Each structure stands twice: as structure tokens, then as C-alpha cells.
Amino acid sequence: MKNYFYCYPKSKIQMISSFEPPSSSSSSSDEDSDDEYREEDGNSERSNSKVCIEEVEEVEKEEIASRKRKRGKTKDEFHPCPFCEKKFRYPNKLREHIKIHDSNRYQCLECSTITKFGTYGELRAHHKLHHSKASHKCPQCSYTNEKPAFIRRHFEQNHVDGIPCTITGCCIKVAKNRLKAHIKEYHTSIPLSTEQTRSKLSFNKCPLCEYKPDVSDDDPEQQQKDLEDHVQRIHEEREPALCTLGCGVYLGSGSVSEHLSTCSSLIQNIPSSSQSTPALQNDEWNDANTETTLSTITGTSSQFERDSVSEVTNDLSENINDIDEEIEFGTTEPPNKIRKHSRSRVHGDFSCEICLKTFTLRDNLRKHVRVYHSENSQKVVKSTGPKHQEQYKCDRKSKDGDETTCGKTFRTEQALHDHFNVHDGIKPYSCHTCNQKFHARDRFAVHLSKYHQTSIKDLTARVATFGC
């Protein structure tokens, strides 16, 4: 029997020792002698294996030390870069690093002259700018592409299915999300700051005749004002009116509000802030344009002793109507204080005699009495003062098909009615420029402000003026 032990590496096979146990010429009949022989054989094998492992470890250590001596370096030795302070353990890493310091290692192979760049990104930008294959260009904007199919898709999405530009005189259609970029790129004279003037809806000509605004002026506000003056002067037959305050100035169309801020008669007749507003006594109006105070309408609690809430409501409504009639048919003496507001928007401190809620406008008090304290009213208001906020709850069925109600609450009645449009699937608010429809008025206002630089107030005034 022979035992072989090998040393690492396998390519260098070395026989460490061999062992041949003594052989018996004849079969032994004594079992004790066989047991002793097996014990001696096992002990010799274990001792030989320990000696072999120790020798293998010593050989490996000597080979590792010899390889390090041949390299001529240790762990603490590094290769420094001659251009910077970096150090590298291996020379190939240093060679790759030195290429970074070569500022002109990227060369354009398509230029007639030698053109080199320090980074690959600069080379790509140069190639895209001067050697790009995008030979196809959009006929209405600066979009380019190397494939005609992309040009056709861009033209359909942006210029066919898009919305018209809101600037007067521009007939280009663009995508809704690119409208601001189009105005910034092609209409540089129009400021797009955070406090920009909202441009009106564009009209290329008068809807009643063939008149067109002056296109030499690039400002859309001036073009729109010119068109409005034309409609008021020609189609509505309005002549310049004399100022009713007695200053002798003739007012043109659209200049009433500007004149009131600088009218000499108005400035002279405005009393100082220290003077109190004259009270109206004995149901006689000495001044038809004087603001109404709280004492004029409400009075004390002893003066209004009623048997029921309906009587108080009726008397309060009669008092408000009497004030309106006295304002309308009152004396025409020169007023001590001129108000810019109309007759229906008289300011003051108006209080409800039933719930003691106060209002600054008489119209709001009238509306409050009609909604909360009339005989047909079903709403209940708490006498907690003006801080109380009404909650309008939706009683429609849920959209999921369950028998439960929706249960959503809203602060205003208008918001509740807009929410009903969601249940009914109705979109009553439509944008005439891009044909987009909305359930709620607030979402329509956000759309006009974001994409058309206008507001619902301007749109309503435009419809009232032009009918479109």
C-alpha cells in the first residue's frame, strides 16, 4: 500500500513520502497481532500528513516572497501622476489617467480643418450642430429632424390639432403645452414676467364690419383698445360726453375711470377722513350720494318690537326698498361726498336685526334676508356672527353604484352646482379657442390663465361687448 501527498501548485507534483507496510508470508491466525499492526499504520499516516502540510505552507510563503522581490515594490509604493497629485498602485491605471490631461484628444474627422475638443460631450455637440443629418425642417417653426415621418407627426400634433396663438396677427397653431414657448420665441416684444399684463383674446377684425386694427403696433393691448374704440365710436354711435362733476372735460370712450382718478371737482369735494359720514334723520335724504350708516337702516331693538320673525323680515325688506327709492328720487343738491360706486353698491355697516350678522354692502344684506329669513327659505343660519361659514353637502348617490350618498361638502353654492355636473356628466364651461370643456368654473379659470393669458372676467366682458 502506497500513500502519495502533493504540494501546491498542481503543476509541480512532488512525492513527499511513501510507506510500505510489512507483508505477511502466510495468513496470521493471531487476531491480536493484526490489531497492533493497524494502530501503528494509522499513527504513521497522521504524522506524515502533518509534516506535509507544514512543508507546503513554507513553500508557498517562499514563492510569494520571491515574486514580490522580483517586482521590486511593496504595498507602500505608488506611481505618482506628473500633472497632478494623484497616485496609482499600477502603471496601467496611471497611463489611463494621464489621457485626461490631454485637452485636445478628441478630434472631429468630418471638418476640413483640424478641430479638437477636450471632452467627448463637446465633440458630440459640435457634430450635432455642424454635421447633423437633420435636413428636414418644419415649415412653420424651427423644429428639424432627419426623418420626414417625424416632421409630419410634429406638424399634425402641433400645427393642425393645436390651438391658435393668442397674439393678435399670429395665425400659427401650436400645441397647448408649447404656447408659452412659442410666444417667448416668436413674440419677443411681449413680456412674460410674473407680473405680466394678461393679453386679451385675439380678434383679427371687427365682428360687425371689415375693420382691422393697426398691425404696425406690435402691442396686442393697443390693438385690442383700438378695436374697442372703433366698435364704440362707429357701431354704438357714442359721442364724447361731458363730465357730470362739473369740471368741463369731455370724456371719450373707455376713459371714464381714468378721468375720475384725476378729476379736479372730485378731489375738491372729497372730505377728510376725520369728518364722519352725515347721518340720515327723520327719513329725509339731504344728500342722495351719501353713504348709508348703520343707524339709518337698523335702529335700536326697542324700535323694532315684533310679534314674529316674518314681520321683522318684511319690515327690513321694506326699509331697504325705501332707501332705494329715496336714493333714486331724492334731491339733486350738490353732494358733499362723491362716490364712484353705483347706486346698488352702497357701502356702510348694515346689520341683520334677526341674527345680528353685519355686512359692508346693502346688497349683501338684502341677499342674506332673502336666503335665510324669508318664508320660502329652508336654510338655517346660526347667530354666531360673520365668522360662520355655510357648508353645502352633496346628497346625490355615489358614482360607484352604491346606495350611499356622495356626502362631499363645499363652501359655496356655486361649487356644489359645479359638483353636480360631475354626477350628471355635463361640461358646461367650454373654451372657444381650443374646444376644451370643463365641469367646474374654477378649473376653466385656471385653464384660461395658464394657456391663454386671460381671465373669466376679461372673457365675459369680451362676450358682452362683441357678442362672441
UniProtKB/Swiss-Prot annotation:
PROSITE patterns according to UniProt: ZINC_FINGER_C2H2_1, ZINC_FINGER_C2H2_2
Species in which this protein is naturally found: Caenorhabditis elegans
Q: Name one GO molecular function term.
A: zinc ion binding
* Example of a GO cellular component annotation carried by this entry: nucleus
What does the record list as GO biological process?
regulation of transcription by RNA polymerase II
Write one Pfam family the protein is assigned to.
zf-C2H2
InterPro entries recorded: Znf_C2H2_sf, Znf_C2H2_type
Q: Region Disordered: which residues?
A: 17-76
Protein name stated in the entry: Putative zinc finger protein F56D1.1
Acidic residues: bias regions: 29-39
Cellular compartment(s): Nucleus
Q: Which stretches of the protein fold into C2H2-type zinc fingers, per the record?
A: 79-101, 136-159, 350-373, 392-423, 429-452
Keyword set, alphabetical order: DNA-binding, Metal-binding, Nucleus, Repeat, Zinc, Zinc-finger
Q: Where is the composition biased (Low complexity)?
A: 17-28
